[in-house]
Amino acid sequence: MRKKITSVALVLMTVLILVSCKNTKQKLQEYVVTYNKTIAPSFRAENVTLTTARGYINDDKIELRFETDLEQNEANKSEADISFPKLIKLMIDKDQVPRQLIEEGVQFDVYFLADDNTVLDKEVLTGESLKDFLK
């Protein structure tokens, strides 16, 4: 009898744990909503005028866009190549870009855009590239 009660309790605990755990796709959706409602409105960085997130659930991918007031030219492109990775590292350190999602296989495509919405710099964050950003 005691063995049966223990077995039933163990099964119930396992079910509760599984129900309460969120899968990666749910975390991805939750992050995008949180980013757009909480992080983006108060986000401040030099030359950044707007930032948004988009989630692509079927591809396990999140796109972060940083619109700037910079013109598209070689000088700004060169500066973006240096400053943008630093900004991303800072965001990872502040958990504004969550390591856990990247480690679970979510890819972050991060765009630094000129004032005409052309790409000044693009970084792709994966489990492998995350190591480079954290150096």
Where in this protein do the model-derived segments appear?
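C-terminal motif of bacterial Sec signal peptides marking the signal peptidase cleavage site
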Residues: I17-S20
